[in-house]
From Swiss-Prot:
Stated name of the protein: L-carnitine/gamma-butyrobetaine antiporter
Phylogenetic lineage: Bacteria, Pseudomonadati, Pseudomonadota, Gammaproteobacteria, Enterobacterales
Entry GO CC: plasma membrane
Pfam families with a match to the protein in the record: BCCT (PF02028)
Annotated family: Belongs to the BCCT transporter (TC 2.A.15) family. CaiT subfamily.
Domain of life: Bacteria
Subunit structure of this chain's protein: Homotrimer.
Organism: Escherichia coli O127:H6 (strain E2348/69 / EPEC)
Membrane topology value: Multi-pass membrane protein
Gene designation: caiT
Length: 504
């Protein structure tokens, strides 16, 4: 019995430091929002302007790593001795499901507006050239390049899971081949895990900060309930309580069903937008945008704008690369776990093709719809953002479609379910990472899960209180900096161990 309690207890060295650090930062922010915004702007400017190039080189190097895996000595190596756990169709569907979060719905609907109103390469705002590049840049930021970087890390984690038979719930577990067991399980490993957890907490709080206003704006549109910060806080509280009830009552099967419903509803809603918005235009715009992407790809890869200093690569490319970096470990662990029995080449190709198709469909359909609404003067996005905020502008891109009430109900349900599953996943991941020897498939303690969901909810509320996108972007970039190095160490550790232990 004591042994069982030990297994389900918290791990103090990785539980309390992130809790204290995040708690102090939240307190300092709430204490003086104006001063916090000044610091946020300074941090954002420093990291993106001084170190933005490093994120760009990181993505390029990881892309070369993907080619090495696909065509190198490990291409035909199998990740485990068992046959694949899931059929290829189910495997790809699970990948798609991982892409349909409310944060993705947020960016997919509004991102193109920012690209055409503040375009790269010195183009005139809202010009034909800016519109031609708008979707192309979305395809760049959410296309093969970032998924290729995830492929490398997914192979690394799958190798440690299924070839080396290691229990990996924190990144330090994978660093034994690189730094030795003493350091991996000592102070160095603890520091690495704490960096990972603090960054992950902020990333999840950021996702909640993006998702919540979509739900509350839907409520205003459907029920006439005014959207306020207090309503955001109430909705987040309800999600936390609902998550606690689901966990306490053993309703995790219900949460998994909700996740499946989210995926099917995503297909349905995207299909609806595709049909009624303008299928012919969407396909033509996508085709043209792929050509623009191929034409400008070298410039996009290395674009830092040091002369004109327009700020586009810092505000978007570096931000998104930090976004990908910060979620890399969590996402790669999930993708690795569903890829048991596949070869390295299968995993790399499957991820890049399957996940790129998922994100490209989302961004093409939603972005094209937004551009059409702008061109036809059906909605005035700058005015909506200035008066009501970004979330209202996104809601109006959906409300402008035919059968607006039915469309809004569908979008409301989709966002609500997506956020319920987000809160559940947040609490589960953080609880698993901060508890002692909770093994895969076991449930971490209820109070720990509730505690982490509360903290993530608080961060979401704090970011919403700060207002605007800059605090959200800064939280991602600041969190991405330490994980930049952690991801590299995990990659190097895999390469070193594979050379020694994964021979013919």
């Amino acid at each position: 019995m004591k042994n069982e309690k030990r297994k389900t207890g918290i791990e103090p060295k990785v539980f309390f430091p992130p809790l204290i650090i995040v708690g102090i930062l939240c307190w300092l922010t709430v204490r003086d929002l104006d001063a916090a915004n000044v610091v946020i702007n300074a941090v954002f400017s420093y990291v993106t302007n001084v170190w933005g190039w490093a994120f760009e080189w990181y993505m390029v190097v990881m892309l070369f790593g993907w080619f090495w895996l696909v065509f190198g000595p490990y291409a035909k190596k199998r990740l485990g001795n068992e046959p694949p756990e899931f059929s290829t169709a189910s495997w790809i569907f699970m990948m798609f499901a991982s892409c349909t979060s409310a944060a993705v719905l947020f960016w997919g609907s509004i991102e193109i507006y920012y690209y055409i109103s503040t375009p790269p390469f010195g183009l005139e705002p809202n010009s034909t050239g800016a519109k031609e590049l708008g979707l192309a840049y979305s395809l760049f930021h959410w296309g093969p390049l970032p998924w290729a970087t995830y492929s490398f890390l997914s192979v690394a984690f799958a190798y440690f899971f299924f070839v080396r038979k290691m229990e990996v719930i924190r990144p330090s577990s994978t660093l034994v081949p690189l730094v030795g067991e003493k350091h991996a399980k000592g102070l160095f490993g603890t520091i690495v895990d704490n960096f990972y957890l603090v960054a992950l907490i902020f990333a999840m709080g950021t996702s909640l900060g993006l998702a919540t206003p979509l739900v509350t704006e839907c409520m205003q549109w459907l029920f006439g309930i005014p959207h306020t910060l207090q309503l955001d806080a109430i909705i987040i509280t309800c999600w936390i309580i609902l998550n606690a009830i689901c966990v306490a009552c053993g309703l995790q099967k219900g949460v998994r069903i909700a996740s499946d419903v989210r995926s099917y509803l995503s297909f349905l809603m995207l299909g609806w937008v595709f049909i009624v918005s303008g299928a012919s235009f969407i396909m033509n715009y996508f085709t043209d945008s792929v050509g623009m992407l191929l034409m400008y790809l070298p410039r996009m890869l290395f674009y830092t704008d040091p002369i004109a200093k327009g700020g586009f690569p810092q505000g978007w490319t570096v931000f998104y690369w930090a976004w990908w970096v910060i979620y890399a470990i969590q996402m790669s662990i999930f993708l690795a776990r569903i890829s048991r029995g596949r070869t390295v080449r299968e995993l790399c190709f499957g991820m890049v093709l399957g996940l790129t198709a998922s994100t490209w469909i989302l961004w093409t359909v939603l972005g094209s719809n937004t551009l059409l609404l702008i061109d036809k003067n059906i909605i005035n996005i700058p005015n909506l953002i200035e008066q009501y905020g970004v979330a209202r502008a996104i809601i109006e891109t959906w409300a402008a479609l035919p059968l607006s009430t039915a469309t809004m109900w569908g979008f409301f349900i989709l966002c609500f379910i997506a956020t319920v599953t987000l809160v559940n996943a947040c609490s589960y991941t953080l609880a698993m990472s901060t508890c002692r020897e909770v093994r895969d498939g076991e449930e971490p303690p209820l109070l720990v899960r509730i505690g982490w969901s509360v903290l993530v909810g608080i961060i979401g509320i704090v970011l919403l209180a700060l207002g605007g996108l800059k605090p959200i972007q800064t939280a991602i970039i600041a969190g991405g900096c330490p994980l930049f190095f952690v991801n590299i160490m995990v990659t190097l550790s895999f390469i070193k161990d594979a050379k020694q232990n994964w021979k013919d």
